[in-house]
Amino acid sequence: LTGRAGRRGIDKEGNALVCWSPFVPFADVVGQASSQDFVLRSAFRPTYNMVANLVVTRTRAEAELLLSRSFGQFQMDRRTGGKRSLVRALEARLGVLEARGFADGWRLEPRGRPLVRVFNEADLLVVESLASGLLEGLGPADIAAVASCLTFHRRGPGRSEPPARKGEINRRILGIIELAEDLVAEERRHGVPSVEPPDPGFSTAIRRWAAGDDLSEVLTDEWSGGEFVRNIRLVADLLGQLAEVGTTSVARSARR
C-alpha cells in the first residue's frame, strides 16, 4: 500500500517512512504494517469543486488521465470489473455544470468560477445560491442563518420542518430549497448522485446567537454544547469561503 504504484497493485513491494512520535508505540506501527486485515478504501470521488479545478488547471486529456490512474479508479475496477469510471463521473458532473450555465465545454463561465474556491458538500448549490442573489442584501446574523441550511444536517430520524413563508430569512431559505430541487432533477438526468437537501433546522439558533443573544438562552435540549459549536464552525467555514468568492455585499456581511 506504499507509493502510488504500489497502491495501484503494480509494485509487489513498497517502502514507507513513519515519523517517530512519543505518543505512538513502535509495536503499534509494526502491527499496522504487518496486518493482513487492514483494508484501505479510497473515498476519492469527483465533486463539482474538483471538476472546476481540473478545468482551470488541466486539459481535458490530462484530467482524464489523472482520474484513470488514481487509486480510486484502481479499486473501482476491482469491484466492478471496469463497469464504472471516474472519468464518466467527471463528464456527468461537467454536463450538469453546462446545463446550469456554469461551464461551456472544457471552460468555466464567469458564474462558475467561484466553484474553484467553494469546499462544501453542496458546493454547486452554494454557487447557485450566490448566482441567484439569494445571499444578497443580508446582515451578518441573517446571512449566517441562511448559510446554515447549506451546512446543517439533522442527526437521527426525521427531518426539520420547512420554514414558514413569512420573513425574509425564511423566503431566502425556501428559495435555496427550490434551487436544490431543480438541481436534483438536473442531476438525475445526468446520472449524478445528489447530496442531502438543505436543512433549515439550525437557522433560528445561529441567528439568535449571531445577533447577540446569550448562549445560555440559545442552547436548548435540542442542542448539546458540542453539537452547537460543531455547527457554528461549519457555518463559519462556509462564510469564510463566501467572503472570498461573493459579491462585495455578500463578502462584507460574511466577514462580519
Stretch-by-stretch model annotation:
Residues 124-178:
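Leucine-rich, amphipathic alpha-helical/linker segments
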Residues 15-25, 96, 108-115, 163-171:
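A glycine-rich phosphate-binding loop feature that marks nucleotide/adenosyl-phosphate handling sites
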Residues 1-32:
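Conserved segment of the helicase C-terminal RecA-like domain
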Residues 6, 22-24, 36, 45, ...:
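Short, glycine-/Ser/Thr-/acidic-enriched flexible segments
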Residues 158-256:
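C-terminal amphipathic alpha-helical interaction region
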Residues 31-36, 122-123:
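Short secondary-structure boundary/capping segments
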Residues 4-8, 19, 54, 100, ...:
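Conserved, well-folded catalytic cores of nucleic-acid-processing
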Residues 43-148:
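C-terminal accessory/connector segments of nucleic-acid motor ATPases
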